[in-house]
Amino acid sequence: MTIIRKKHPLIKIINHSFIDLPAPSNISSWWNFGSLLGLCLIIQILTGLFLAMHYTSDTSTAFSSVAHICRDVNYGWLIRYMHANGASMFFICLFLHVGRGIYYGSYNMIETWNMGIILLFAVMATAFMGYVLPWGQMSFWGATVITNLLSAIPYIGTTLVEWIWGGFSVDKATLTRFFAFHFILPFIITALVLVHLLFLHETGSNNPTGLNSDADKIPFHPYYTIKDFLGVLVLLMAFMILVLFFPDILGDPDNYTPANPLNTPPHIKPEWYFLFAYAILRSIPNKLGGVLALILSILILALMPLLHTSKQRALTFRPITQTMYWILVADLLILTWIGGQPVEYPFIMIGQAASIAYFAIIVIFMPIAGMIENNILDLD
């Protein structure tokens, strides 16, 4: 068996990636989220595949087909709620994974980090298009509002929006193409994940100290396969509690009303995992400015390697930057809350303050904190 594992051209790749991979001996549970994201992706592809067997991407039957899946298909309700809540688990793992990367300075592995940002954009695009498919009120109006943002692009904006819509409003053509893209994107994401792993295995994993761990490596299997399996059990437990006991807690009640272009819901808002970006978008009165801020709220992650001023990699031994980091986390929670609130006083002011704080902490305060720590520790 050892010979096959090490010699066979295909199994050899798996061996070098998941079995004999040299891993730092001290990586904590924060390093579990990569494998958990892989699990989430597999769950989403499998449940999505079974949903696609029964779903029809036509405006007149889309809503009914989802109801049919829940009522008439064997375990259709389970597959549907696993898919809907699987997206939430996916984003929880994603945010924790990115947060870990920022805390421990993993962004210094630039190729891996940039690939991760591309993956984040791809997953967000997939989730947005998936939310449109049930063709409820929030599906329709969410699609209308978000795609309409592209009209802010000078000169080509309106033409671009009508091209994406396939007409003069969100209609049958839009739903059909969103279904097509929603189906294909997870497979593209899977390919990007392999590239992400390829780049990671060029440098090896980071570790909680941020120091070089070449002198102290252990094989991935059995140590981290067992450790990851514990994470898998915890995730599946939380996931199934969510799916079986509180399946609608993260959804919007408006989406149980079929899409009606003549009736606008009182508060149009996306799923909870987009609320922080939605709050940043809404906090700028200008349409184009809002769109740019929305894109920058994620794209700013690409600047993190350039904004790294400290002589140390991780925040483990850097209390000032640690404080900035946790203020940033609190700020993102505030933005998430604001994104779900109506556009009125005092929420507008809080949203604008939190949006300014978000960019200021990343671009100004964290780099300055790094320089101060260098001086304190006399690392210049």
UniProtKB/Swiss-Prot annotation:
UniProt subcellular location: Mitochondrion inner membrane
Membrane-spanning intervals of the chain: 33-53, 77-98, 113-133, 178-198, 226-246, 288-308, 320-340, 347-367
Alphabetical list of CDD domains matching this protein: cytochrome_b_C, Cytochrome_b_N
Key words, A-Z: Electron transport, Heme, Iron, Membrane, Metal-binding, Mitochondrion, Mitochondrion inner membrane, Respiratory chain, Transmembrane, Transmembrane helix, Transport, Ubiquinone
Coiled-coil regions listed: none
One Gene Ontology biological process: mitochondrial electron transport, ubiquinol to cytochrome c
Primary subcellular site in the record, as a coarse category: mitochondrion
GO CC aspect terms: mitochondrial inner membrane; respiratory chain complex III
Protein residues bound to heme b b566: H97, H196
GO molecular function, one term: metal ion binding
Co-factor remark: Binds 2 heme b groups non-covalently.
Positions that bind heme b b562: H83, H182
InterPro entries the UniProt entry points to: Cyt_b/b6_C, Cyt_b/b6_C_sf, Cyt_b/b6_N, Cytb/b6-like_sf, Cytochrome_b, Cytochrome_b_C_euk/bac, Cytochrome_b_N_euk/bac, Di-haem_cyt_TM
Membrane topology qualifier: Multi-pass membrane protein
Alphabetized Pfam families for the sequence: Cytochrom_B_C, Cytochrome_B
Amino-acid positions noted as binding a ubiquinone in the UniProt annotation, renumbered to this chain: H201
Cofactors demanded by this protein: heme b
Record-stated family: Belongs to the cytochrome b family.
Further remark: Heme 1 (or BL or b562) is low-potential and absorbs at about 562 nm, and heme 2 (or BH or b566) is high-potential and absorbs at about 566 nm.
Name assigned to this protein: Cytochrome b
Native organism: Chionomys roberti (Robert's snow vole)
